[in-house]
């Protein structure tokens, strides 16, 4: 589960870099939506991992 958390974090950071720095140009709006979507998925993944009480796997 920790693996998915790290994947969501990396994708959210990359989407944020493209969305908030203007590199994406016309796609900045889409990048912002994707950024927040993956932040939500990151939080959900962290909560599920915490509720299961299992030790994280790498």
Swiss-Prot record:
- How does the record say this protein sits in the membrane? Multi-pass membrane protein
In terms of superkingdom, the source organism counts as: Bacteria
Any single Pfam family the record assigns to this protein: DUF1328
KW Lipid biosynthesis (keyword) present: no
Transmembrane segments annotated in the record for this chain: 6-26, 28-48
Q: Which UniProt keywords apply?
A: Cell membrane, Membrane, Transmembrane, Transmembrane helix
Q: Does the keyword DNA-binding apply?
A: no
- Cellular component annotations (GO), alphabetically ordered: plasma membrane
| Cellular localisation | Cell membrane
The record ties this protein, via InterPro entries, to: DUF1328
HAMAP family hit by this protein? UPF0391 (MF_01361)
Give the family from UniProt: Belongs to the UPF0391 family.
Q: What's the protein here called?
A: UPF0391 membrane protein Shew185_1413
List the top taxonomic levels of the source: Bacteria, Pseudomonadati, Pseudomonadota, Gammaproteobacteria, Alteromonadales
């Amino acid at each position: 589960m920790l693996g998915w958390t790290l994947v969501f974090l990396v994708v959210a950071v990359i989407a944020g870099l493209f969305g908030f720095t203007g590199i994406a140009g016309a796609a900045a709006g889409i990048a912002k939506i994707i950024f927040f979507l993956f932040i939500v998925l990151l939080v959900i993944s962290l909560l599920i991992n915490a509720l299961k009480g299992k030790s994280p796997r790498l």
